[in-house]
Design a protein with these regions (language model features):
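Membrane-interface helix/helix-cap signal primarily in integral membrane proteins
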Residues: 1-184
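Hydrophobic alpha-helical transmembrane segments in multi-pass membrane proteins
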Residues: 114, 165, 169-312
Length: 312
């Protein structure tokens, strides 16, 4: 009941903040910060804008998902722009077996969609160095990858696998991934996050074998601090998808248990991780990825538990 109330309240609040359909295609002038790395498509640039000021005579507490056709320059995270926009309400198709776009926009706190009016002046006011630091770093890594490799689909694939920016992957490549059954590998999930955590832990265990540091006390606390810091940083750089956040929550819970020298059953740890995610974002339960992630992990735990019983 508590979860239902939280979901209902959050959804009602977000729905009330959305751009009204009665004002579709209305032009407004806004001042806002680029909130995420832009995606270049054929003839247009897609990006999210966090509005600070607007002529709309109503608050816009969320993101605007915008397209800019023939943009003179690529907007970068942290830049403050004054733009004239033509907005539409948050709408989308919801066909059986396909993604519910309107619900997806709602989960991402997008209050409206639209495009930059080409004939109106667009002004870059300043680059706010402290705004959107994680997104700025993601964009910088993606740019370095693009500059280091010859142009081609491999650039977008590496950007997707490293910092979770998959918007530049060509449609034909997605079709090839789907046909060969490897599309899921493009999503940074629990496999990647767990691998990162275990690799860092392995490096630390190697360091403890070095005599100058091998005799230091507090090694368990040091391991936990370093592993959590690196894992959290990787999840943020990867875009903080639901599967990655689920794994991070489980890593945090396991670390706490190790620090307290207490062990909980894995299924209870999984349940606590789900509760943490729902507390942080009640709308997570509306995502297919949430259920796939937790159900798949629960199934693996059941299989492992059954396997241990057979061995016994």
């Amino acid at each position: 009941a508590t979860e239902d109330t939280a979901v209902t309240y959050t959804a009602a609040q977000l729905l009330g903040n959305g751009w009204p359909c009665a004002r579709d295609r209305e032009e407004i002038t806004v001042v806002g910060v680029i909130a995420a790395p832009a995606v270049e498509r054929a003839g247009r640039t897609d990006f999210d804008l966090a509005v600070r000021e607007s002529s709309a005579q109503r608050p816009l507490p969320g993101l605007l998902r915008l397209s800019w056709y023939e943009a003179p320059t690529q907007p970068r995270p942290g830049q403050l722009w004054r733009l004239t926009l033509r907005l539409r309400c948050r709408q989308g198709l919801a066909n059986p077996g396909s993604m519910d776009r309107e619900l997806d926009l709602l989960r991402q706190r997008v209050v409206g969609t639209g495009y930059v009016v080409a004939k109106a002046p667009a002004e870059l006011l300043r680059d706010e160095g402290l705004a959107q630091p994680i997104e700025r770093l993601r964009a910088r890594i993606a740019q370095r990858i693009a500059a280091s490799l010859p142009a081609g689909p491999s650039v977008s694939v590496l950007q997707g696998l490293s910092v979770g920016l998959r918007g530049n992957v060509p449609d034909e490549l997605w079709e090839a991934f789907a046909a060969t059954g490897v599309a899921h590998l493009m999503a940074i999930s629990g496999l990647h996050v767990t691998g990162c955590s275990l690799f860092v832990l392995w490096l630390l265990r190697l360091c403890w074998k070095w005599p100058p540091v091998g005799s230091l006390r507090g090694r368990i606390a040091a391991e936990i601090a370093v592993v959590l810091a690196v894992t959290a940083g990787y999840v943020l750089l990867a875009g903080a998808s639901l599967p990655a956040l689920r794994t991070l929550a489980m890593v945090v819970l396991v670390a706490i248990q190790r620090l307290l020298r207490r062990a909980l059953p894995l299924h209870l740890t999984l349940a606590l991780a789900a509760a943490l995610l729902c507390a942080a974002d009640p709308l997570a339960v509306t995502s297919v990825g949430f259920w796939l992630s937790f159900v798949a992990t629960a199934a693996l735990l059941l299989i492992l538990d059954a396997g241990s019983g057979w061995r016994a």
